[in-house]
């Protein structure tokens, strides 16, 4: 699609969002066509809700998030097919695989194991593997990434290439508030089982999160070697485990309860990360 065409779509979506109270299931014409085109761009990987610049900073295409939100107003509740044993759901968002045959799957180039669920407007890159998992609308899953069993990729989340989301991992979705950025896992990261990264936090390239690490915007991420504390972002090539920090002394003079934090136990370079097993990295 030409740049001028995308700019026209953006303008239409922005205007419609400003007047969203008037958008409903009866809305036709330019607004519906623009929203559908935006969802198609997301679904095909032609555009992303956010992309990383050469300087490492992420730019969020807020108008695409607005298109996703407008689609909830445009689409009525309906039967959604594609469940195990011909089960159906009652929702406003169709399955990404609705109407797909072997031709579409072969062209897409990823593996979709039975009971994985992907909603329309999520993009799955070639080489990715989806175990029984859930990928929400507007999300992006990069090449050769594994989304393991019961992992969830939230709305508009951005998952890089060669990432492993272990069993039960939760990557939070961010549609609103509008100014908030999506949760991002950059290339070559490993997220350990049952870990959660939410609220638009970023895990930078090559990082390893051990099992059961929880990171939100208010979580202290403490570098054990330097004492530096980060919020909302794990630095590149960090090895992170769950930990605690001493709490404040209570009014009665007794030590307060320790509070949860994430601990950077070491940092490695790209060469070491590529040659060292995950278990070895996590051992102290």
UniProtKB/Swiss-Prot annotation:
The keyword Secreted does not apply. SUPFAM superfamilies: Trimeric LpxA-like enzymes. GO terms for molecular function: 2,3,4,5-tetrahydropyridine-2,6-dicarboxylate N-succinyltransferase activity. Disulfide bonds: none annotated. Substrate binds at residues 111, 148. It is found in: Cytoplasm. Belongs to the transferase hexapeptide repeat family. Its EC number is 2.3.1.117. Homotrimer. The gene is dapD. The keyword Amino-acid biosynthesis applies. Keywords: Acyltransferase, Amino-acid biosynthesis, Cytoplasm, Diaminopimelate biosynthesis, Lysine biosynthesis, Repeat, Transferase. Transmembrane segments: none annotated. This is 2,3,4,5-tetrahydropyridine-2,6-dicarboxylate N-succinyltransferase. It holds the Pfam family THDPS_N_2. One of its GO terms (biological process) is diaminopimelate biosynthetic process. Pathway: Amino-acid biosynthesis; L-lysine biosynthesis via DAP pathway; LL-2,6-diaminopimelate from (S)-tetrahydrodipicolinate (succinylase route): step 1/3. It catalyses: (S)-2,3,4,5-tetrahydrodipicolinate + succinyl-CoA + H2O = (S)-2-succinylamino-6-oxoheptanedioate + CoA. One of its GO terms (cellular component) is cytoplasm. Its main location: cytoplasm. InterPro entries: DapD_Trfase_Hexpep_rpt_fam (IPR005664), Hexapep (IPR001451), Hexapep_transf_CS (IPR018357), THP_succinylTrfase_dom1 (IPR023180), THP_succinylTrfase_N_sf (IPR037133), Trans_hexapeptide_repeat (IPR050179), Trimer_LpxA-like_sf (IPR011004).
